[in-house]
Amino acid sequence: MNYDERGFSQMEFKNINTMRKLNNGVKIPCVGYGTFRTPEDVAERAVADAIEVGYRHIDTAAVYGNEEAVGRGIKDAGINRKELFVTSKLWNTERGYESTKKALQDSLDRLGLDYLDLYLIHCPANEKQFGTDAKRLNAETWRAMEEMYHEGKIRAIGLSNFMPHHVAELMETAEIKPMVDQIEVHPGWPHTEEIKKLQSMDLLVEAWAPLGGQGSTVLKNETLQQIAARHHKSVAQVCLRWVLQQGVLPLPKSVHVSRMQQNTDFFDFELTPDEMKQISALRDLGVQCADPDEVDY
C-alpha cells in the first residue's frame, strides 16, 4: 500500500460504509461505531440508533461490559447479519490458549451471534507483568486465535494496543499475519511513526478515541477550531478526516443521534497537506491509554 503526502488517496471514500480490504481479503467499512464506556443500560438503544443512522461496523469488547446490550441493539435494528461488521476483543485476564477459546465463545453467547467479523487481543502481555513468559503467553493466545479463524468462528483476527515491536515479536511464531491493529490515535497523540510502521507490515490501523476521549482538550483546541471554520465543519469532523486521510479507520463514539450523524459527515472535504502537518504536530491534548509496556492489569 502506498501513501502520498495527503495520506491514503488511492481509494475514493464516499461514505462511512466505503469498504477497505484486509490482508486476507475480508472487507471492512471504513468507519466504525465505538462503544467504549457506553453503559449496559444505554448501549442497546445507542447501537440500534447507530445502525439506523447508517453505521454497519460496530466495535465492542468483553471488558466494556456491554456485549449483551450491543447484541440486543443489533437484534433490535432488524437488519441482515451479513450487512454488519462486528468486532469484539479478548480481555487481558483471558490470555492463553484454552482461555482464549472460551472467551470467544462467551463473547459470541453474550452478543447472540454465531461468528465475529473481527476478534482482537485487547493488549499485549508485557515483560513488566509476566517477565520472560510474556512472549510465550502472546504466542499461545495468538495460536488459539488462528485456530478459531480456521474454524470459521472469526472472519478476521487482529490486535489492539500493540506497538510495532510487539507485532514483530508475535510474527516470529505466528502462522497467520494479523489483519488489524487498533490503537489510540487522535490530534495530540498522533502515533505517526507507529502508524507508518504498522501499515508497512500490511496491517490496517484502527483509531480508538479519534476525537480525543474523556478529559481531552482536542475539541477545544484553537488550531483545530480554525481549520474547522475554514472548511465549515466541526472540530470532530476535522479530526475524523485527519484520521481517514492517513489510511486509518476511525471509531467515533457517541450515544446522541445528532452527533452520530455528524460523525458520518466528513466525506465532502479534504484537508490540505499543510493542515495535515499542523494537526499531526499538536501535542499534549490528553492521552487515554497507558504505555502497553508498562501496564499491569
Regions picked out by a protein language model, each given a short descriptive name:
Residues 100-121, 147-151:
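CE4/NodB-like, metal-dependent polysaccharide N-deacetylase domain
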